[in-house]
A protein has these predicted regions:
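Active-site anion/phosphate-binding pocket segments in diverse small-molecule metabolic enzymes
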Residues: 1-125
Length: 125
């Protein structure tokens, strides 16, 4: 298994952590209880379930549109994101997400170990 995405059963695959994420940036934080990011359906795929916000248990992600995502805060969020903050979302379905990008960054800890080209980018029919 190269990736474990959000759609795979967390209990069945508990030996593996999710390894495919999309890095997104907060664009709007003016409304209470939510923030807007620059990763919508075109960045994370329209397939459901929606992505999971990495490291955040009391927040949910919804696609606001093709270009924008909505981060919804629960009752006890660990933080409130501000404009410019970066966060990772664990995508729900790997194949269509990988197909959307020209390259992928292989990261271990905080270090980028490799940049892999995606030569079949956009080749799905």
């Amino acid at each position: 298994m190269l990736f474990r995405s959000g759609e795979q059963d967390l209990e069945v695959y508990s030996d593996f952590a999710a390894s495919l994420t999309v890095l997104t940036t907060v664009l709007n934080d003016q409304y209470e209880g939510r923030a807007t990011s620059d990763a919508g359906a075109k960045a994370c795929t329209i397939n459901q379930p929606w992505p999971i916000i990495k490291g955040e248990s009391d927040m949910t992600y919804r696609s606001g549109s093709d270009e924008f995502g909505t981060i919804l805060y629960g009752d006890n969020p660990s933080r409130n994101y501000k404009v410019g903050d970066k966060l990772e979302v664990i995508v729900s379905h790997c194949d269509p997400v990988v197909n959307l990008y020209d390259q992928m960054y292989a990261i271990r800890g905080d270090k980028v170990e490799a940049v892999w080209p995606i030569s079949a980018r956009g080749m799905s029919a």
